[in-house]
Amino acid sequence: MTENKTKVKDLAAELGVTTKELGQVLKDMNISAKTSTSVIAQEDLPRIKERVQAQRDGGARKEGNPDVIVRRRHRDGDRASARAEAKAPEQEATAAMPETSAPERAEEADKPAVAKPAKAPETEAHARARKEPQAEPVKARIIRRPDEPAPVAKVVEAAPAETPAPEAPAVKATVTAEAAPAKTVEPESERPQADKPATARVVRPATPDASAVPDGTSSAPTLPVRSAEPSDTVERADADADGDDDDAQQRRRKKKRRQPEAVVPQVRVISRPDPAAVAQQQMQQQAAQQQREAGGYRPGGQRPEGGYRPEGQREGGYRPEGQREGGYRPGGAPRPEGGYRPGGPRPEGGYRPGAPRPEGGYRPAGGPRPEGQREGGYRPGAPRPEGGYRPAGGAPRPEGQREGGYRPAGGPPRPGGAPRPGGFGGAPGGMPVPGADGRGDQSKKKRQKGRRTVDFQADGPRGRSDDDVMRGPRGRGKRGKKDVRPAATQPLKAVKRKIKVDEAIRVADMAHQMGLKANEIIKVLFGLGVMATINQSLDIDTATVVAGEFGYEVEKVGFSEDDYLVPKEEDAPETLVTRPPVVTIMGHVDHGKTSLLDAIRKSNVTAGEAGGITQHIGAYHVTTKKGEIVFLDTPGHEAFTAMRARGAQITDLVVLVVAADDGVMEQTREAVNHSKAAGVPIMVAVNKMDKEGANPDRVIRELSELGLVAEDWGGDTIFAKVSAKTREGLDELLELIAIQAEILELKANPDKAARGHVVEAKLDKGRGPLATVLVQEGTLRQGDAFVCGVFAGRVRAMFDDQGRKVKEAGPSTPVEVQGFDGVVEAGEEFVSVADDKVARRIAESRAVKQRERELAKESKVTLETFLSRRADAAEALTLNLVLKADVQGTLEAISEAVRKLSTEKVKINIIHGGAGAITESDILLASASDAIIIGFNVRPTSKVKDIAEQENVDIRFYDIIYKLVDEIKSAMAGMLAPVQREVYLGQAEVRETFSVPKIGVIAGCHVADGKVTRNAGVRLLRDGVVVYTGKITSLKRFKDDVRDVQKGYECGMGLENFNDIKVGDVIEAFEMVEEAATL
């Protein structure tokens, strides 16, 4: 309260009236007060107090509508006097507030009781209507306007008059104000016990049941008021409109009221209900509760007491959901159950004078309320804040959801969980209206945070059908109350719990398909030990494991090259024809492999090889008397291990060449292992039988230790003794090869698409990338599209091993193919496909996979690798190289040999390697990376040489692999810093000491061993312990300075910065010598 102003609620408390009553008084006096917190001027207070007092005394009530008449009927004449005394206050209350709800009239009826405690029985009957126990169903008496037509009233039979009402225990009743139809107590006993004051005991029903709740329990603002006939005798209504006395007894219920704190009126219990009727009523309540929990919509036939309300009775139209957000129902008390509603539309709100009221204020009687008028507002005048002051002194209504609206006094909810239309309560179907508890929007945001939202209309009993949607705005009548579910928040689920994955899938894409947050997938990956980010790709195996964690399956939908490359069916036996055998010649270097092949081919391949050793793998087609044979010649040098392994993989038979005078060597053992790993049969050719020191028995013995036992020794390995020089035993060798091939039954289908392997590949300056391909099945023709490794192309030309151009190549035919996009890797599979598009797509798919593998191999610095480094590891030197070779297989061999040279002191780093001539880009790359260019069987052009000189790039050329390896070793050693080593010179014994001014102590010495030089380092030893290490400052023999003193001579010696020289000390001379470091 301010200095000269008073709030409405404070004045109401002071006068002992409700804010609603005070608000009506203020409006009648034309004093503006919209809410309970509005202030009143000090000068208006006296007039207001007089007006309120006048209304209390009954004068103010006569100013209201005189058309509403309150009549009571008693069956026995003993109550005639009580009815006469109570009639005046009733008429006054209804005259002043013609359509006031029951709690308001009850409150006004309380006021005379405050002034006059000894009230007549009728006035006490009003108090009993507020305070009788809820478990005692007593029906209210209904008033109406005489000018409105009276609908058919449902009759409620009273208890037999002969039954006296038992006395109720004295219990204090709580009165809470709530707008409800008028309700007065019907006396059910002929002997009212006026002399025994008692307070009604509030009894909550065991189970609030919808079936037992009259429809009158809907909040007053939206329910139309029924009128009774204007006669002196008003029949009581029956809940089911069938006149059943028992049902009427069961459906009558009393409501608890909150007593004004100022007065505790005493009431008198007229009658108690029949216990059997109460038990039946509770059973009906439980049945209705189960029906409501089942979610069923309340059919029209289940409408409890109160009767059917035609749709035309409720003016104002259907109020959409959300108009009453957060608002409390003024009056606070539970509405009385089961009373008749006086005829005519009952508007929402508090006092309704005849004059129209503005929006948000008091509504004109019976007038329609515009939609949105009551949103969260305070009824009596203007919008009030949520949880604002509730008239009649009620306690704040607890928050929470309630089915069909929250009922503070323990009253049962509406049947079926439906809300009171327009009243404060839940949304249809028992869902809370957004913002109804003041927290709706905020809590919804919290629930929806971080989740996908799917809006859907639920079908079924509570859902809204398509017809409802097409119908548009719904009416306000009984059939207009359709349940509309709000937007439900739930994770978006895939229609089919499958995700489609190509070869790999990003974490973000996977999360999108599964309807999850990427963080959830990353959590699972962390649990699997995979450190992933949202943009990281997962292979199909990892994706399958992760999807399984969430109950999803993985479906591979990407491009699969197997559909085009893998044969769909086996070759029929009738389509197979005999093919020539593929024979690989293997053995140690210089054991005569190529010479043997030359003798068979009657050619001279060896003469053209650098250093007389084979450094390429060659494929040759030879026609012999025994048939056609394809030979593969492999290098024997240790650097060509991969090349030998590749030859063993694509061959049918291995001929192991061993020199008779040299025996089994290292590469011989390696060749045996490669052949066994490939599962290829081995035939041994003991070469160089023409030499004097030839010992074939030694070879047979050594090979038997490797598991190759000769047939003469009881084994199954074929041995042939040959001489490439004299051609001895060659025919026998070819015959044995033919027999072995016949045993193997080598066949192939020449009518299918060609398939083979690349034996060797190179880059020719004029013809571009070339590859030697050994066709293993099918027929390769000029113009065919093919895919090989990460490259695709079309066969432009083919050449045989003699350099002749051919149009087609059948099974077991080696050809040189022109038409590649790049230099392929030796050993790659060569496959002919239908067209160029398929070939390019397969090549692109392989290129992507190869790039992913290379990126995955890149080593990243981790804590383990960082700590595992040695302290001096950072000082290790690196030799950068750019390798260029004539063919791909040789490049592979050189790269492997050079990598093996790396040591802890010097690392070899191959910046780039390729087949073909040295180009300008190679020079620029070497200049940028400070590298040396190694050329093997390649030469640069004059222009490339000029650029190399300008960029100061060193280019080295080699044609023999072991020379290349030796020079790289020397270069690595030259990068190391020289090592200093101490060299002992001699010793001298101190025999005398001399002290020379300004010079110091001079030692007179005798050279006992070696010599002492002027620039040498010295150590002074005393009793075998080093006392001083330093240099000689002066060395003299007699008075002459000398450079050195030999053994047996005497000399004078001065030491640098040291004078503590004693007789008997030994001076040892030494010098430091630098030596080249080794790897």
Curated annotation (Swiss-Prot):
Residues 578-745 form the tr-type G domain. This is Translation initiation factor IF-2. Belongs to the TRAFAC class translation factor GTPase superfamily. Classic translation factor GTPase family. IF-2 subfamily. It is found in: Cytoplasm. Residues 687-690 are annotated as: G4. GO terms for cellular component: cytosol. Residues 419-429 have a biased composition (Gly residues). Residues 612-616 are annotated as: G2. GTP binds at residues 587-594, 633-637, 687-690. InterPro entries: EF-G-like_DII, EFTu-like_2, IF2_II, IF2_N, P-loop_NTPase, Small_GTP-bd, T_Tr_GTP-bd_dom, TF_IF2_bacterial-like. Residues 52-488 are annotated as: Disordered. Residues 587-594 are annotated as: G1. Residues 633-636 are annotated as: G3. Residues 473-482 have a biased composition (Basic residues). The keyword Protein biosynthesis applies. Residues 52-65, 75-90, 102-134, 185-194, 306-327, 461-471 have a biased composition (Basic and acidic residues). Transmembrane segments: none annotated. One of the essential components for the initiation of protein synthesis. Protects formylmethionyl-tRNA from spontaneous hydrolysis and promotes its binding to the 30S ribosomal subunits. Also involved in the hydrolysis of GTP during the formation of the 70S ribosomal complex. Residues 150-184, 276-291, 348-370, 380-398 have a biased composition (Low complexity). PANTHER family: TR-TYPE G DOMAIN-CONTAINING PROTEIN, TRANSLATION INITIATION FACTOR IF-2-RELATED. It comes from Nitratidesulfovibrio vulgaris (strain ATCC 29579 / DSM 644 / CCUG 34227 / NCIMB 8303 / VKM B-1760 / Hildenborough) (Desulfovibrio vulgaris).
